[in-house]
Amino acid sequence: MDPLIQELTKEQIRDDIPAFRAGDTVTVHVRVVEGTHERIQLFEGVVIKKKGTGIGATYTVRKIASGVGVERTFPVNDPRVAKVEVKRHGRVRRAKLYYLRERHGKSARIAEARR
C-alpha cells in the first residue's frame, strides 16, 4: 500500500475495540442523534461474520427481535460506535455463520468456548 495512504489511515484506526470472532456474543453501543440530543442504543447479538482489514473492516451482528431476525453491519472503525462489549465467546468451526439464518430455537444456539 502507498505510504501516504498508510499514514492517513493509521490515524483513523481505533484501538479501543476488543478482539472478537464469529460466534461471539457482543453488545454494540451505537450513538444515535435524534434532532438536537444524542443517546446510546444497544444492539446485542451474535457476530456472524468479520470482513476485511484496516480502515474498511466490517462485522455483522445478528439478533432475534420479536421473532424476526435482525442483522446490522458495522464498520470496525465507525465513530458512531461508542464501544463494543464481548459478552461470551462462542465455539464455532466456521468463519461465516450464514447457516444461522435458517436455524430457529435451540438449533440456533452456539456452545460457549473454553478460552
From Swiss-Prot:
Keyword annotations: Ribonucleoprotein, Ribosomal protein
Single biological process term from Gene Ontology: translation
Alphabetized InterPro entries for the sequence: Ribosomal_bL19 (IPR001857), Ribosomal_bL19_CS (IPR018257), Ribosomal_bL19_sf (IPR038657), Translation_prot_SH3-like_sf (IPR008991)
Single GO MF descriptor: structural constituent of ribosome
Gene Ontology CC entries for this record: cytosolic large ribosomal subunit
Entry keyword Ribonucleoprotein: yes
Pfam families membership: Ribosomal_L19
Annotated TM spans: none
Family annotation (PANTHER family): LARGE RIBOSOMAL SUBUNIT PROTEIN BL19M, RIBOSOMAL PROTEIN L19
Family designation: Belongs to the bacterial ribosomal protein bL19 family.
Purpose: This protein is located at the 30S-50S ribosomal subunit interface and may play a role in the structure and function of the aminoacyl-tRNA binding site.
Name this protein carries in UniProt: Large ribosomal subunit protein bL19
Species in which this protein is naturally found: Lactobacillus acidophilus (strain ATCC 700396 / NCK56 / N2 / NCFM)
Taxonomy of the source species: Bacteria, Bacillati, Bacillota, Bacilli, Lactobacillales
